Amino acid sequence: MLINDNLEQQAQALFKSWFVDFEPFRDQTFKESEFGMIPNGWHAAVLDELCSFISRGLTPKYDENSDELILGQTCVRNNVVTLDNARKHKPKQRTEKWVQQWDTLINSTGVGSLGRVGIAYFDMDNVAIDSHITVVRPKSALVRHYVGRNLLNRQLEIENMAVGSTGQTELPKERVKSLPIMLPDENALIRFNAIIEPIAYQLYRNIEESRRLACLRDVLLPRLMSGELTIADL
């Protein structure tokens, strides 16, 4: 969807302006860090410090009669998580590996897919991830957009964190947890959220509307084609 592509570009441009080029903070005093010069009051952390849960997904037992969905790596693309290629499965039990809104998912196996990052905008309670994906769940609303946008901005770096031989590469969970990340001060995050949240929620609304229309299409199209319904009935 072109509108969503434009919103994604705006969001990433905003992140880069604030946290790569430091445009809103150029009048502040800077200090040396492992990330180069950063504003005073900011500091270095590792990703695990900003998250409540980082884990690979589960091994699914596929079942087309189930209402539970499982996401594979083809569901993470273009910076978002999509349900287009989700499959149905029968879980043994519910776990933290069920996707929550604002989770960030990272493809974690295979050359060409590993390192691809997407944000889960949808708000559903029946979607899990398979073992080829790592879920990154920020621990608070204060950092959730920052963490997601930070990882989206570092997809090539994440790809290069892979281990293993060609064709059998994977991204170890511990490497994700220990990923160095710059942590802005609280005031900067609050100001950033005030701008990024309206964009994020518009993306959420657009994705939900697209999903709703797709479901409606899937229900109506077979009935129209069979003659059970006509255009006049709609």
Language model features with spans:
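Non-catalytic DNA-recognition/assembly elements of restriction-modification systems
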Residues: 1-58, 178, 182, 186-232
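Glycine-rich, flexible loop/turn motifs
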Residues: 18-21, 31-34, 54, 72, ...
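Short coil/turn segments at secondary-structure boundaries
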Residues: 27-29, 60-67, 161-163
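Sequence-specific dsDNA recognition surfaces
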Residues: 30-31, 45-60, 69-103, 129
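Structured loop/turn residues at beta-strand edges in well-structured enzyme cores
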Residues: 40, 45, 66, 100, ...
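A generic structured-segment signal
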Residues: 64, 70, 105, 109-113, ...
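A short beta-sheet element
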Residues: 72, 94-156, 162-167, 172-176
